[in-house]
Amino acid sequence: MKLSEIETAVEGLQGVGPSTAKLFSKMGIFTVADLLSTYPRDYEDRTKKIPLSEYKTAKVHTVCKVTGYEWFGYGRMKTLKIAVTDGTAQAWLVAFNRPFLQKSLPEGSLVSVTGQFIEKYGQLQSSAFDAVKIADTGDINDWQNKTAPDSAVLPIYPLTEGLSQKVFRKTVALALKQYGMGIDDEIPQEIISERKLLSKKQALVYVHVPATISQAKEARATLIYEELYLFEQKMALRALEHRGTLPADSEKNQLQNATSSLTKEKFAASLSPKQKQLFERLEFDLTRDQMQSIFEMNAEIDRSQNENNSMENSAWNLQRNPFSMQRLLQGDVGSGKTLAAFFVCLRVVDYGGQCAVLAPTELLARQHADNAAKRLGPLGVKVAFLTANIKSAGRENLLKALKTGDIDIVIGTHALFSRNTNYKKLQLAVIDEQHRFGVAQRESIVAKGRVSEGKYTHTPDVLMMSATPIPQTLALTVFGDLDISTIRTMPEGRKSIKTYLSVMGHEANVYEAVRKELQAGRQAYFVYPRISEESQENQDKSLKSAQEMFTFLSNKVYPEYKCALVHGKTEETEQNALLDSFRDGTTNILVATTVVEVGVDVPNATCMVIEHADRFGLAELHQLRGRVGRGSAQSYCFLIYGKNITQTGIERLKALHETTDGFKIAEEDLKLRGPGEVSGTVQSGYLTLNIADLARDKEVLKTARLDAINFLQKQQKI
């Protein structure tokens, strides 16, 4: 039986009553499987003797003789003090609320003492101690070179109020005794042997009741590997289900593609008619990585088509390959991911299909729609913009055109998968900033194009795009069932953004540096963590607000320049007008909140000032910085932080100061925040790890992934 299949309630264990079971339930522990899967967070090694004389270096664990008692305080506040010695020093055990110890540890008895000792009032004392009697009497000198009989490695579990380590350990021991020997391995035996792992039952014993610290380490190594192996196995099977191949096949192809020489001529020859038109109209060259990514995605779009559905006849045919593209396109800020996605949309249009481009905000959706209309409209592609704010008459006509197939590419927000939105032939769903959408929302847009015929169900091709690079370990876990295309190279002519750190109180220096850029005809952003002083009750009132600073900057600092204020509560029509004014250069300074994190592309803007930068996340700061550096001029980012910045905050800002490489920043973000907070993985609904840590165990992850895929490949051949 697998551990996860043991559904016996904790209350069913001997000695576990309703009140104890209720305490366990507060920790999410309801069954024996939950209990045995709650691993110790640490261990206390009581196998080594640490005498009183070494109290400064470690927690004391020694055998002492009780030499007397004292009491201090009055009435209910009266407290027992027990005098002890282990032959190396004298000490006092301060027994708050434990008067019964006078009887259980009588004078002259030998006791095993474990605790943290400090010097206080001229005495060596401990108030947080364990003391167990081992003999009624005896010579302390006989124990100088011996450890106490209760010596052991004790697991330290996470607890909830009212639940003690003693009760937790006892309950785990009962569960192991009753169910431990019947637990089966979940990893294939050949891999257990090859990787020199423990069996599952042995690993559970060693992790919960280790005889030595090395046993505990061995058990944890096995359980970490097992967790990652099973996760990768699940991802591989999911990939097999929706694309017909295991991840290893795709990775091998990607590696071959990456190392092959994809020339500009070979790339051009692979393009569909409308793709070729766009390629020839571009006023700049695509980067190597853009061409490679488009080439990879084209191959998958072609694969998902049936041979009877060629570009020549553009006939939509339900008898398509049952497997569809499931790909993540990642790249740094400003690397050209959107243009690559437009190329793929054109291939789908050439096949006679429709595309839906989903963005999390109206601002970003509008930018995509404007760019698509500008670049794809002249090619005869019908592009539409759809959000919840579209007026009823126009909306009705738009929805009708979508349903009849008169629209090729629709770009918008959540309205794309609303109940009243229907497509004639949705073939590609592009999901930008995929981490901003939950699993159910992604499924909703895909479901709009899912069709069935006979035994096959065809699902639209899916292209997800990330705003910033995905850490490698997340790419192998959360996105382990996807093919991944990566754009590392930036467009030619871009200069690396120079980033400077400044502490609050020295803003004037930053403002002066920005003034020089404004005098040169450039533009600037100023970003703040809140809208106004009254914007949110739970926000720190000491934080500057966008509204307050707009007034200050426009009246006091830059009265000669035109400033605009944009935030999340700005009306859509007004926001569009303000942003258009900034884009065309009429407005010199844009004061904003993080609403400008995405969806604003102004090549002439060269300064990004972020005040209270320590209040923003690393990925968020990198994304904001990416609003500048989009032209050929040198750009600057100024991060102004508070004087009470935390150590983590300092590390975050240092990472930005030291590099503009989004891939390095993504890895640093993973270290600082953990996988659960990076790239929306909590929202994605995929990642729940119990003992493994992606930042710490990334090499184990790679090994487990390869093992899982290789084993499944062998099973396929059999």
How should each PLM-predicted stretch be described?
Residues 284-304:
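N-terminal pre-P-loop "Q-motif" helix
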Residues 632, 645-718:
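C-terminal accessory region of SF2 helicases/translocases
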Residues 56-76, 115:
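Structural detector for short beta-strands of small beta-barrel domains
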Residues 72-258, 262-280:
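Upstream accessory/linker segments immediately N-terminal to the RecA-like ATPase cores of bacterial MutS
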Residues 1-12, 231:
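Long, highly charged, low-complexity intrinsically disordered interaction regions
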Residues 308, 323-654, 714-717:
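Inter-lobe coupling/hinge segments of SF2-like helicase ATPases
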Residues 41-58:
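Short boundary/loop segments of OB/S1/cold-shock single-stranded nucleic-acid-binding domains
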